[in-house]
Amino acid sequence: MWMFLKLLLFVCSSWWSCAQASNCNATSPYRTLDGTCNNLQNPNWGAANTAYGRLIAADYGDGVKSPRKAASGADLPSARLLSMKLFGDEHVLEPAFTLLSMQFGQLVAHDMGFTSGSTDILPCCSEGKPVSNPVPRCYPIPVASDDPVMGSAGVQCLDFLRTITDCDADPSSCSNSKKAEQLNIATSFIDLSVVYGNSVEENTPIREFTGGLMKVETRDGSDWPPRNPNASTACVQRSPEDACYLTGDARANISPQMAILHILFLREHNRIAKQLAALHPEWNDEKLFQEARRINIAQYQQIVFYEWLPSFLPLPDNGGKRSLSSVLDHQYRADVNPTTLNSNAHAAFRYFHSAILGHLHLDYENRTKAGEISFTDHTLNPAILEAPCKYAQLSRGMATQSMGRIDLNIDHELKHNLFKFNAPFGNDLRAIDIQRARDHGLPSYNSFREKCGLPKAASFDDFTSLLHSPQDAARLASVYASVDDVELTVAGLFEKHIPGTQVGATFRCILLEQFHRTRVGDRFFFETSDPIVGFSREQFKQLRKANIARLLCDNTPKLEGMQSKAFAAIDAGSNKVLPCSSLPAVDLDPWK
């Protein structure tokens, strides 16, 4: 029997009842938890529990909501078949970047999107066989009898549930053949909703309501998120004592390294709140909480846009419609909708899945290897973090170990053993990505090429100049009947990388469009000059110093040093490990 994570999801029972501009406080310097009222003219733009955005209208099999079909009207090839025929599972590393770069990217992706219903437990397959009377949302992934890994085990299908759409939530809103739109239960903003939650209801259980602090539990001298009251269903525990955390995002427990980043920004919030309390003893809990949250988010935004994003989408602009210079636009525009794009969340931004590794290193302070753990052995069980020395060792390992190369491989553990636990077989992350894009009606690769102002392919021969190797066009032709069947999620990974970047032209177009909207459409973005929501000149100068290396140092006991560019590989010359005290730090004196 498959085991899946039962997560606590808050989905507004009346998500379609829009916030009104008249209910927004235009003079508040603080963003709401659910993202409403960021845009005062369109208060629901970017808010939690609203539909993902679109660059191109959905392409459904029935024109309304059924998964995308081939141009002929037939079903597209099995997502598992494509995973096996087109993608390898070789262990290829990207020596220029650390695993921290991949993991931080996953945190950002979670911050901007949480697909509604994606973690529900409604089995479509039982022991690898289709269930009788499946629920309507079932869309299992077929597995061929000659599958070289799962076929011998008699596996016929892999579990997959369709995303909840606006039509599911409110059928009356989808009359007259309106296309269904999938719901995002996270805010679309770069706002640390993964730490603070996407609603007051999610935030309340994780706040201390004293001194502006987030709730923590102290064990062995370190602060940890509170234990999840539903640990037996939220995590896969080996014993009732295993740590399972309650955070602003239920996916914090997915892996130890994801949990580390959640804990990092949780501890940073409390570190800031304590400093502000010392500077302003007259401030009450709410003021301290909101100011600490505001600073924490600003530091995070500085890191995302100026330290992390340039590592895979660097200047200069060598193609596509958006350059990074346009992403780093300093002025808010009320006419820009920041809503997370479906094609970004469920295709372009998933390119990072190639960089995930199946084994995670633990490192000593001198960066020699202390050991390693299996990703699948610790999926949904971050308990190892509280074992002696392991939190610091895994943090060092994450900032030292090379991430996987962005290529046509995906780690064996994620391709065959995802969520395996004690079962004889697991799921396939690449197949899930392909199936999810179909579920969401993402149009063809050719359609997105055209949208991005790039040449379309009229024949498979036209793919030759676009892809990694001349043989790749033939590989696509062997599984797709038409060039217009080729999927964005698949071909985007086959594209030649633009020199100096980690992506091809089509994914780059989508990613840059998304981050442009995310930045320019956020009224509270930390660079704004708006006197109501912006920072003073002296405060802003300090926020510019924020960097991931110093945050790791300040919030990781027993960590004594870090390279200044922690997303990049350690280099004895230009990026050597430095004492934590020598790394730039944000000084809160301007907040006096």
Curated annotation (Swiss-Prot):
Q: Does the keyword Glycoprotein apply?
A: yes
Gene Ontology biological process terms in this record: response to oxidative stress; vasodilation
User: Where is it found, in Gene Ontology cellular component terms?
Assistant: extracellular region
Q: Give the UniProt keywords, A-Z.
A: Calcium, Disulfide bond, Glycoprotein, Heme, Iron, Metal-binding, Oxidoreductase, Peroxidase, Secreted, Signal, Vasoactive, Vasodilator
- Residues with an annotated glycan are N25, N230, N366
Q: Where is the active site?
A: H110
Its UniProt entry gives the catalysed reaction(s) as: 2 catechol + O2 = 2 1,2-benzoquinone + 2 H2O
Where is the secretion signal located?
1-21
Please name the Gene3D superfamilies in this protein's record: Haem peroxidase domain superfamily, animal type (1.10.640.10)
Site feature (Transition state stabilizer) residues: R251
Residues that coordinate or bind heme b: H353
Domain of life assignment: Eukaryota
EC number(s) on file: 1.10.3.1, 1.11.1.-
Subcellular location(s) per record:
Secreted
KW Cytoplasm (keyword) present: no
Q: What terms describe the molecular function in GO for this protein? A: heme binding; metal ion binding; peroxidase activity
- List, alphabetically, the InterPro entries matched: Haem_peroxidase_animal, Haem_peroxidase_sf, Haem_peroxidase_sf_animal
Q: List the disulfide bonds.
A: C24-C37, C235-C244, C452-C509, C553-C580
Q: What does the record give as the function of this protein?
A: Inhibits noradrenaline-induced smooth muscle contraction in the host, probably due to the oxidation of noradrenaline, resulting in vasodilation. Exhibits peroxidase activity.
Please report which protein family the annotation says this sequence is part of: Belongs to the peroxidase family. XPO subfamily.
This protein is called what?
Answer: Salivary peroxidase/catechol oxidase
The species this protein belongs to is Anopheles albimanus
